[in-house]
């Protein structure tokens, strides 16, 4: 149970692929102009990570070490192609919005990195959990950044949610404030860099506060041989 908890905590927070490893910055900065786009790409990446880790782990005993990287890339490309066709079939509006960034998941360092660092050494179910945790950590970072940029840029949240979740999701759209001229800095890549920098700073402050709290609450060590002395 402790290993499962450690995998989840590492993926979601301590070793977050976007906020700690800073991997996959190209889609993170390019696609997160709205919360819907960010959530869509994040969930697609999570699905690819989970299925890829599961497949790589299941085949690890029959994968020659000399050609493992090309095999990993072939597995990732196959999974990404399947996910791309699913999005094209069931969420065509989102498919058009994400464009080239769906097939570019193949080249995402997160996917190859987890296949090499974790899935090639662990069992299938732990590997699938690792992929899911890493993917959800990246999805969370994308969603927060996309929400921040959409609110500051357009004054809305979940605009175009129907392209991801269906026509019923139109009711999810919220207008935080009305604006006739969008705040372009928030919508363009420079705004994504600024938003990501703010998120990194907030995570650092939270981590430092947690370290100080643990240091205060930790019991003081008793030197060996001192117990029982008057």
UniProtKB/Swiss-Prot annotation:
<protein>
    <recommendedName>
        <fullName>Ion-translocating oxidoreductase complex subunit E</fullName>
        <ecNumber>7.-.-.-</ecNumber>
    </recommendedName>
</protein>
<feature type="transmembrane region" description="Helical">
    <location>
        <begin position="18"/>
        <end position="38"/>
    </location>
</feature>
<dbReference type="GO" id="GO:0022900">
    <property type="term" value="P:electron transport chain"/>
</dbReference>
<keyword id="KW-0472">Membrane</keyword>
<dbReference type="InterPro" id="IPR010968">
    <property type="entry name" value="RnfE"/>
</dbReference>
<keyword id="KW-0813">Transport</keyword>
<feature type="transmembrane region" description="Helical">
    <location>
        <begin position="86"/>
        <end position="106"/>
    </location>
</feature>
<feature type="transmembrane region" description="Helical">
    <location>
        <begin position="39"/>
        <end position="59"/>
    </location>
</feature>
<keyword id="KW-1133">Transmembrane helix</keyword>
<keyword id="KW-1278">Translocase</keyword>
<feature type="transmembrane region" description="Helical">
    <location>
        <begin position="182"/>
        <end position="202"/>
    </location>
</feature>
<keyword id="KW-1003">Cell membrane</keyword>
<comment type="function">
    <text>Part of a membrane-bound complex that couples electron transfer with translocation of ions across the membrane. Required to maintain the reduced state of SoxR.</text>
</comment>
<keyword id="KW-0249">Electron transport</keyword>
<dbReference type="Pfam" id="PF02508">
    <property type="entry name" value="Rnf-Nqr"/>
</dbReference>
<dbReference type="GO" id="GO:0005886">
    <property type="term" value="C:plasma membrane"/>
</dbReference>
<comment type="similarity">
    <text>Belongs to the NqrDE/RnfAE family.</text>
</comment>
<comment type="subunit">
    <text>The complex is composed of six subunits: RsxA, RsxB, RsxC, RsxD, RsxE and RsxG.</text>
</comment>
<keyword id="KW-0812">Transmembrane</keyword>
<feature type="transmembrane region" description="Helical">
    <location>
        <begin position="125"/>
        <end position="145"/>
    </location>
</feature>
<keyword id="KW-0997">Cell inner membrane</keyword>
<dbReference type="InterPro" id="IPR003667">
    <property type="entry name" value="NqrDE/RnfAE"/>
</dbReference>
<feature type="transmembrane region" description="Helical">
    <location>
        <begin position="63"/>
        <end position="83"/>
    </location>
</feature>
């Amino acid at each position: 149970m402790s290993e499962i908890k450690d995998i989840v905590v590492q993926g979601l927070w301590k070793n977050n692929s976007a906020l700690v490893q800073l991997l996959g910055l190209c889609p993170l900065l390019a696609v997160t102009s709205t919360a819907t786009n960010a959530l869509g790409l994040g969930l697609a990446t999570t699905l690819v990570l989970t299925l890829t880790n599961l497949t790589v782990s299941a085949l690890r005993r029959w994968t020659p070490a000399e050609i493992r990287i090309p095999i990993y890339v072939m597995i990732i490309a196959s999974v990404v192609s399947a996910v791309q066709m699913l999005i094209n079939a069931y969420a065509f509006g989102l498919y058009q919005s994400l464009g080239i960034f769906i097939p570019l998941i193949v080249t995402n360092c997160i996917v190859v990195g987890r296949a090499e660092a974790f899935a090639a050494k662990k069992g299938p179910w732990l590997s699938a959990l690792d992929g899911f945790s890493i993917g959800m950590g990246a999805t969370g970072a994308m969603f927060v950044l996309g929400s921040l940029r959409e609110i500051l840029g357009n004054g809305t949240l979940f605009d175009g949610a129907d392209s991801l979740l269906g026509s019923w999701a139109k009711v999810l759209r919220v207008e935080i404030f009305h604006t006739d001229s969008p705040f372009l800095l928030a919508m363009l890549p420079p705004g994504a860099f600024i938003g990501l920098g703010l998120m990194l700073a907030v995570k650092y402050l939270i981590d430092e506060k947690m370290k100080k709290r643990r240091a205060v609450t930790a019991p003081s060590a008793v030197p060996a041989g001192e117990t029982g002395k008057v």
